[in-house]
Amino acid sequence: MSEESAPEIQRGNGSFTGPGGGNIFEHWWRPRNEARAAVILVHGLKDHGARYDHVGEWFAGHGYATHAFDLRGHGESAGERFFVASFDEYVDDLDTFVARVLEKEPGKPLFLLGHSMGGAVASLFVLLRKPDLEGLVLSAPALEPTANVSPVLIWLSGIISRFFPRAPVTKVDIKALSHLPEVIEAARKDPLSNERPAPARTGYEILRAMRRIRERSHELTLPILIMHGTGDHLTNPDGSKKLYKQAASEDKELKLYEGLYHELLNETEQERVLEDITLWLDERLR
């Protein structure tokens, strides 16, 4: 476990034993003074918590204790790289981490922030486990296949996943992450997030999670903020629009950012996005 200090925040990282006995790596950023609330950040496919250091710093600087972890098979956590036999394993990881954060931040209101595939993990977690949350924030959530994924390909994915679960099929186009060249370059050089396609089973489980969320989206009743860039080619903005319409939440908001690519938190207007999230969080605490 390590911990570093900055003038206004404290940051650190460590690890704990996750469901099934694997090692799960975690990160945290806390304000030096008493935190107003806690935020848990859930990253996406082939992603990891350390890439959100600037996000953790931002929220800690605005009074929010921020916690992130590397999903199994991602970042510095144990597990076969980017492989998951069932999406419920990611949900189990998050469930364990939420309990851990609640122990560290007793009595604090808790928000969940899920990005990309992490948005699907967070959404399914809320639907299945019914946690006591102050609100849910979804950044470019993976809720519906993109236009280039045909119904035939979706059907075939189940067959490929069954017989060739580790076949490399799910590729992430790094150039579609952001307009910022430095973000693309950093992603290319990141040894924890390489350009190797993810396994077929993982891709199929993501598609299955999308369907499960669509089937139960009307059960969402907690405050929810959904954000998507209209230029996103990695996750479908239509999925965010549909979730906004179908969610039963009385307190729900959809924000579309014209022309922005997939990583809203690593984009040309990332400060605006962070300000929008912070304002939304602040308003839920009043």
Q: What residues fall within each predicted segment?
A:
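Short beta-strand/loop motif that positions the catalytic acidic residue
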Residues: 220, 226-228, 232
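Short alpha-helix in the alpha/beta-hydrolase fold that links the catalytic acid
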Residues: 222, 236-245
